[in-house]
Amino acid sequence: MFNWKDISMAGVIILAIIFSTCKKSTLQASINSPENKVSNYLNQDETSYELISQMTYTEFYEKSQVNWITFDEAYKKCKKNPRPIMVDVYTTWCGPCKLMSSQTFNNMQIAEYINDHYYAVKFDAESKDTVRFDKYVFVSTDISNPKAPHQFAASILDNQLAYPSIVFLNDQIQRLDVIKGFMNAQSFEPILSYYGTGDYQKTKWEEFKKDFKLSVKQ
């Protein structure tokens, strides 16, 4: 099985998938040192969201401030010019995903920081497209089922399919953390900085957050 925790680049996966619906949940421990993982300190309350609009994701892309690329493109760029990768795993029917796309990612300061410090990937967890990078291939688990999760989403999220999920990878394509649920710009800024600057390697999240000075304007 492809292991995002410990392996930079390993083989193709075949997964038995347990599908879960779009929700906000208390974030679970996942990878690396618990003291240096943001998700271990977040305790988000269950919240209901209305769909913000009938905008399609094509419209979101057109209006987006973030330079979204495919995972294969991010992988190739990372090999030439190493930097972290941020993956936004979403679905087209997910209200909180649309809210994060239209508000958080389109905040000018957030978008500029992402573009300057990360390779940003937006991935539809129910896509029917084949994902290829290096010599590895990920496909939909069921082409005939529009709601079937993709192997890539199931792999990178350890089958914990809740949306949106923001995955942070280092420049070796090793997974650092998974942040689940909607976050506004001010909540997201310190997390971006923590993984974007590499402070997670030397500073515990609680210490970093305590000293962090917000600059984002809502």
Question: How should each PLM-predicted stretch be described?
Answer:
Residues 66-83:
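A short beta-strand-turn-helix
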Residues 110-146:
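Thiol-based oxidoreductase modules, predominantly thioredoxin-like and allied folds used
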Residues 139, 143, 149-167:
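Structural micro-motif
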Residues 81-98, 120:
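Short active-site neighborhood of thiol/selenol oxidoreductases, capturing the structured segment around
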Residues 162-178:
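A short, hydrophobic beta-strand/beta-hairpin element that forms part of a small beta-sheet core
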Residues 6, 21-63, 177-218:
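Non-globular targeting/processing and membrane-anchoring segments
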Residues 98-115:
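Typically the conserved alpha-helix immediately C-terminal to a functionally engaged Cys/Sec
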Residues 2-8:
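Bacterial N-terminal signal peptides that target proteins for export
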